[in-house]
């Protein structure tokens, strides 16, 4: 699903100003930790057509895996108790792809396209990627965290 969404929406999914809708799926590990691996593989597949080449395939996929594992950690207590994750945990789960991709993809793009001005490009590209990630995660990912328990009929207890 990640790869299909990314490739289907390719014009907005690649580059320094990207709005990769598939990144909203990075909240799935909050409830289903094993989906981190699927996100990693989907990202690797999607990044095979990236202009940044093999660096994006390797490091972009690892960034998505890192973000997924962080999201899974944010949901650990909620999965154990059956309650919805706290607001703070939901925000952290959404911030994790923003941070991972801002740093990693910012570096990949700077290295791939502006090596002579790496640090300046890294800061600019990283900020642009993080901004797009934040848009996707907070506009789509945050509501998805609220919808997943209803969609999958997960047992919910009142959070204290």
Predicted region positions:
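A generic, lipid-embedded transmembrane alpha helix
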Residues: 31-42, 101-106
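Small-polar-interrupted transmembrane alpha-helices in polytopic inner-membrane proteins
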Residues: 2, 39-47
